[in-house]
């Protein structure tokens, strides 16, 4: 049996760790949105609990999801009176955007 080069094993380990971190970001993004927004918006595949609240999986049909990045980090305010203001730190914004990008239906 030939010895596996150390560089290959290191690259494989980094790839696995990177994939694991990306999966954790997606789960964290989903959890943050569920906690902050799930009482009105569909965060996953189902219908939104509030009939006028758009499902997050269709946001990309209205505008680029990345456009939300600044608003989420600086404080998201809507003209809708029932929607509270939300502000997330940079790591949470990254996780939220990653999750939103992963669920978009085009």
Residue ranges and their predicted role:
Residues 1-3:
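N-terminal secretory signal peptides that target proteins for export/translocation
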Residues 34-43, 96:
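The canonical Cys-X-X-Cys-His
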Residues 30, 45-73:
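Gly/Gly-Pro-rich "capping" loops immediately C-terminal to redox-active cysteine motifs
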Residues 16-32, 52:
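Electrostatic cytochrome c docking/interface patches
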Residues 6-17:
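Bacterial N-terminal signal peptides
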Residues 66-86:
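Short Fe-S-cluster ligation motifs
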């Amino acid at each position: 049996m030939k010895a596996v080069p150390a560089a290959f094993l290191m690259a494989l380990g980094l790839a696995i760790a990177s994939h694991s971190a990306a999966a954790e970001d997606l789960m964290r993004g989903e959890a943050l949105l569920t906690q902050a927004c799930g009482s009105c918006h569909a965060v996953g595949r189902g219908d939104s609990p509030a009939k006028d609240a758009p499902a997050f999986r269709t946001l990309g049909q209205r505008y680029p999801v990345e456009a939300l990045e600044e608003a989420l980090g600086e404080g998201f305010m809507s003209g809708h009176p029932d929607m509270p203001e939300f502000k997330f730190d940079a790591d949470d914004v990254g996780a939220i955007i990653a999750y939103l990008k992963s669920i978009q239906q085009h």
